[in-house]
A protein has these predicted regions:
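Positively charged n-region of N-terminal signal peptides that target proteins for export
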Residues: 1-5
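Bacterial N-terminal signal peptides
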Residues: 6-16
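Boundary at the C-terminal end of the N-terminal hydrophobic targeting segment
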Residues: 19-21
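Short, well-ordered beta-strand segments in beta-rich or mixed alpha/beta enzyme
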Residues: 24-32, 61-92
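N-terminal targeting signals for Sec/Tat export/insertion, comprising classic cleavable signal peptides
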Residues: 25-55, 82-83
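An amphipathic, aromatic/His-enriched active-site/gating alpha helix that lines ligand/cofactor pockets
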Residues: 47-60, 78-123
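Acidic/histidine-enriched, glycine/proline-rich intrinsically disordered or flexible terminal extensions
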Residues: 122-133
Length: 133
């Protein structure tokens, strides 16, 4: 019985090694972004998050999309490893988030200290896969 379990486990590990791309990970974020503010959101992303991300070790790039049916922005941020992504302190992220919120609030004519105009709807982690073969 144990021999069968060990064999099954070895097969699963071998298969997972072929399917999983590597140690890479994708950070997934969804934000509530009204249609009338999509351009403001993109400009603020370009001014604040993009330059900061480009300086982070392990940052590979990101995809940005907008879902008009739900009025949500989606960001898929590609990292070389989960450890590199998670090594970034929450304090550093908060500084950039405040800068982002400030840029957006200024564009909307709101107080610099107003709450985040694009609330986080979902935060997740995805593993990239390769098709077998």
């Amino acid at each position: 019985m144990i021999r069968k379990f060990v064999l099954l486990f070895a097969i699963l590990v071998m298969f997972a090694g072929q399917v999983l791309a590597s140690d890479a990970v994708i950070e997934q974020l969804r934000l509530k972004v009204p249609e009338s503010q999509v351009q403001i959101w993109l400009e603020a992303e370009q001014q604040t998050w993009q330059p900061w991300l480009e300086q982070q070790e392990g940052f590979l790039g990101r995809d940005i999309a907008w879902d008009p049916a739900h009025e949500e922005g989606q960001l898929l941020i590609h990292w070389a490893t989960r450890d590199q992504w998670k090594a970034i302190s929450s304090d550093e992220v908060e500084v950039v988030q405040r800068q982002f919120d400030s840029v957006v609030n200024a564009a909307l004519g709101r107080s610099d200290t107003a709450e985040s105009p694009f609330p986080l709807v979902l935060e997740g982690e995805l593993l990239p896969l390769h098709l077998p073969g």
